[in-house]
Amino acid sequence: MQKRHTDRESYFDEQSQTSKNYYIPYIKEVIGHIPDKVLEVGCGEGGNLLPFAEAGCRVMGVDIDATRIEQARTFFAQRHQQGQFIATDIFQLKDKATNFPLILLHDVIEHIRDKERF
């Protein structure tokens, strides 16, 4: 399990496959379509967002770790995909995170200290 978290590009690809094979089919089943805009809180390298971008969605990823955000930008650019990635605390994001019909939190909620505010 440690290797899976130290090889960030492999982890990116693993997350991408999870979204492609599970999240997107489930979302299509439940709401009938993929929303046009997707926000991921705690996006890391953005792997979960890649299949949404490939499907034509506007994607935004937010993570408190600036290194992960830089990796997200790099991994998306290498795959010729568009995405907006912001290194900040979700509570500092304010207006940029409004009007997203779909918000993902994959292995993140337990790291948010002020859950009441969230």
Cite the ranges covered by each PLM segment.
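A short His-aromatic
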Residues: 107-111
